[in-house]
Structures are given as structure tokens and as C-alpha cells.
A protein has these predicted regions:
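An internal, D/E-rich "acidic patch" concept
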Residues: 62-120
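Membrane-interfacial helix-loop-helix junctions in multi-pass membrane proteins
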Residues: 54, 58-66, 82-86, 93, ...
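Membrane-water interface segments at the C-terminal ends of transmembrane alpha-helices
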Residues: 22-29, 76, 136-165
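Membrane-embedded alpha-helical segments of multi-pass transporters/permeases
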Residues: 16, 20, 24-32, 37, ...
Length: 307
């Protein structure tokens, strides 16, 4: 069990490091110059500065250093809890995150809860009723791009019915994210339900005279939900990453919109901070699920100990 736990923690650290390093490499492979974008954001033309002034600005932000040294400075600062200073806004990145993370957490948590409830309910109803429409509905929901769902909801519920605001609201963004996340969860649960209902202990329970609902609730649901736990991390990842698109479409002042603005201006410290926080949330949830799974299914712990 100890080896299993240490292995999962080691994998989590590697994933975080890989996400950070890959993001850093992509940002520095972009053809644009971060300093020029920073000056443009301040309304200054780079051609109006002397070579000495340009060199001083690059030195101030460490842009004149070799790329490996810039990488090390960013990484060592992150390990100390220092995300650095925004190149375009000249404020600590941690302050920007603190200002924007509240709306994003509210959106992500709300969407995750709605997705869990809706996905589980849809999977149970589809399995219990065996209605073809319900069985195929998750595949339909997972096939639509989120920006299309967002624009459809705005057009119908905001412009035509006038029930919800087109920008800055919470209900429509939550629905937009939940359609995809709940559809993915429902697909996994339906497959798990079908496999569980064919197990010998379920057949025996039916032979003893238990009703279909009793068999589903007492025997099938708990065992079918165990494999679906592994997808909880994916659901959380979907809700976090989806916030970038959703907050942009609905003009919500959250971390997602901050990330979009930072990418467009090539604000490296901000982008690295957002990616690191998002990856940390994703990795942490998956790590918790991995550590809880052996407690709920002792076979995992036994197989891990055997190896």
C-alpha cells in the first residue's frame, strides 16, 4: 500500500512538472516578442526607444538571459510560492489570481456538482428504463462544442426568452459546462451499470425475488459507481479547462478570461501561474481519487501489495 501511495504521489509531481515545462516551452516558441507586446499594452512604440532603453527593459524583466536560466528563475520562484510579476499589468501575479479565482471556483464547483447529479441520474434512468433515447442522449450531449452550446443558450434564454443575462451570469455558464461533463460521466456509468447487472450476484438477487429497483439500488449502483470514480478527475478537469472558453463567451471576470488575456499579450508569468494552478487542481483531485479507490475496492490494495 505504501508503494502504491508513493507511486501515485510521484506521478502527480511528474505531471505537474511536465505541464509547467511544456507551457513554458510553447510560450517561448511563439514568434512574437514579450517585450514588444508589453510596450504596446503601455502605448509605447518599440521603435521610439533607444537601444539602451530596450536593453534596460529586457534586463529588468530578465528577458536578456538565456532561456534555460529564465526557466530556472520561474521554476524556483514557483517552488517558493512566488508567481512573479505580470509583464503587462506590473502587479504580482498572485494578486491577479486572488482577484479572479473566486468567480472561477464558484463556476467550476457549481458545474461539477450539477454534472455529477445530472450524469448519475441520466445513467440510472437510461439503465433502469432501457429507453433508447436516454441511452443515446449522452453521446449527443458530448458531441456538441461548448461554444456552440453557449451561443445557443444565449440566443434562446437571453435574447428570445429574456430569462437570464447574456453576460456575467452564472446559470447559463454552469449549464454550458455541465452538458459535456455530465454526458461523459453518464456514458461511463451506463457502461458500468450494464457490466454490473450481468454479474452473478445480481442474477442471484433477482432469482431471490428482489424487485428491479431493489437490485439496482442495493447491489448494482454502489458497485457500478466504483469504476466511475476514476473519471471524477476528468470531470473536474473538464470544468476547470472549460471555464476558459465559457468565461470568454459569457464575459465573466474569472481566471479563464485572465488566461485568455495573458496568452494574447504573451504575459508569460500569468500564463504559467494559471496553467500551474489548473494542473495542480486536476492532479490533486486525481490523486485523492487514486488514494481513496483502494479503500473502497480492497482488490486494488491487494494487487498493489502483490507487486
Amino acid at each position: 500500500m505504501t508503494r502504491y501511495v508513493l507511486g501515485r504521489i510521484g506521478q502527480a509531481v511528474v505531471v505537474l512538472w511536465a505541464a509547467y515545462t511544456l507551457t513554458f516551452a510553447i510560450l517561448y516558441l511563439l514568434p512574437s516578442d514579450p517585450m514588444e507586446l508589453q510596450l504596446a499594452a503601455a502605448g509605447v512604440q518599440p521603435d521610439s526607444l533607444s537601444a539602451g532603453q530596450v536593453a534596460a527593459i529586457k534586463h529588468q524583466f530578465g528577458l536578456d538571459q538565456p532561456i534555460w536560466l529564465q526557466y530556472w528563475h520561474h521554476l524556483s520562484g514557483l517552488l517558493r510560492g512566488d508567481f512573479g510579476t505580470s509583464l503587462t499589468q506590473q502587479v504580482p501575479v498572485s494578486d491577479l489570481l486572488a482577484q479572479r479565482i473566486g468567480p472561477t471556483l464558484l463556476l467550476s464547483v457549481s458545474a461539477a456538482l450539477v454534472s455529477l447529479v445530472a450524469g448519475s441520474a441520466l445513467a440510472y434512468l437510461a439503465t433502469f428504463t432501457r429507453w433508447t433515447v436516454l441511452t443515446r442522449l449522452p453521446a449527443v450531449g458530448a458531441s456538441f462544442p461548448q461554444f456552440f452550446i453557449a451561443l445557443f443558450l444565449i440566443q434562446f434564454f437571453s435574447f428570445q426568452l429574456g430569462w437570464f443575462p447574456a453576460t456575467g451570469g452564472l446559470v447559463l455558464p454552469v449549464i454550458t459546462i455541465s452538458v459535456l461533463a455530465s454526458s461523459v460521466l453518464a456514458q461511463v456509468l451506463i457502461k458500468s451499470f450494464e457490466e454490473t447487472l450481468s454479474q452473478p450476484y445480481v442474477v442471484t438477487a433477482r432469482a431471490k425475488g428482489l424487485s428491479r429497483s431493489a437490485v439496482h439500488v442495493r447491489h448494482a449502483f454502489r458497485n457500478a459507481a466504483l469504476p466511475a470514480m476514476t473519471i471524477l478527475g476528468v470531470i473536474v478537469g473538464l470544468t476547470v479547462t472549460s471555464s476558459i472558453v465559457v468565461e470568454t463567451v459569457f464575459t465573466r471576470e474569472g481566471v479563464g478570461k485572465l488566461a485568455q488575456e495573458a496568452v494574447l499579450s504573451q504575459d508569460v508569468p500569468v500564463v504559467l501561474a494559471v496553467v500551474t494552478v489548473a494542473a495542480a487542481i486536476f492532479v490533486l483531485v486525481n490523486l485523492v481519487v487514486d488514494l481513496l479507490y483502494p479503500l473502497l475496492d480492497p482488490r486494488i490494495a491487494v494487487s498493489g501489495a502483490a507487486r
